[in-house]
Amino acid sequence: MVQAELARGTAAGPYRGLGEFHLYDSANANGPVARKLMALADEKGLAVLAHVDDVATDLLMANTPSRGQQTRLIWAHTGIGGATVGRVQALFARYPRLMGELSYRPGLTCADDQGADRLCPQWRALLLQYPTRFMIGSDTWVNQRWLYYDALTQSYRSWLGDLPPDVARKIGWDNGATLFGLQ
């Protein structure tokens, strides 16, 4: 079924990604469905959006035909459960096409004296180290999340303002647009 759908494409052209999917147990990244999905994405050059922790991310990438070297995985929230900056850095170093999505990311921001969201120093350093590897998203997976959309985008605007303009533009738009062939 998936192969037929991919071959058919969409009115706007071919599919550019698969997902989203959730693995609530990291061990499921070794399962046959996850392995087949990731192999398909790897072979077809499709991006995959996965809500997984750092252990599952490592397994999903390592189990692909390219051993994660050509795999385009969008890591929702840059880790369910809040992987440390060091762990994110290690996975980014190992997998050159791993992308971190930043919605609802625990530990990304710290409140300043006025209560505004500002990037925590270690995250700011990581975003500056890998300016082409992060993107923002909305995570509107249930209707109620739309009630918070304005607040979410305002938070993005606030902490993106802590970055050099070219880096903020990459994270806020360019990286996602490039990933999906929109620019």
Which residue ranges define each predicted feature?
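Short loop/turn motifs at secondary-structure junctions
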Residues: P14-G17, Q69, V167
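Mid-to-C-terminal alpha-helical segments outside catalytic/metal-binding sites
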Residues: L128, T132-M135, V142-Q183
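Mid-domain alpha/beta scaffold segments of enzyme catalytic cores
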Residues: M1-K36, L40, K44
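Well-ordered, non-membrane alpha-helical segments in soluble/globular domains
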Residues: M1-A4, R118-P121, L152-Q154
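Short glycine-enriched loops at secondary-structure junctions
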Residues: L23, D54, V142-Q144
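Divalent metal-coordination and catalytic microenvironments
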Residues: L18, A41, H77, G100, ...
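Catalytic pocket-lining loop regions of alpha/beta-barrel enzymes
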Residues: A27-I136
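Conserved residues at the C-terminal ends of beta-strands
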Residues: F21-Y24, S103, D174
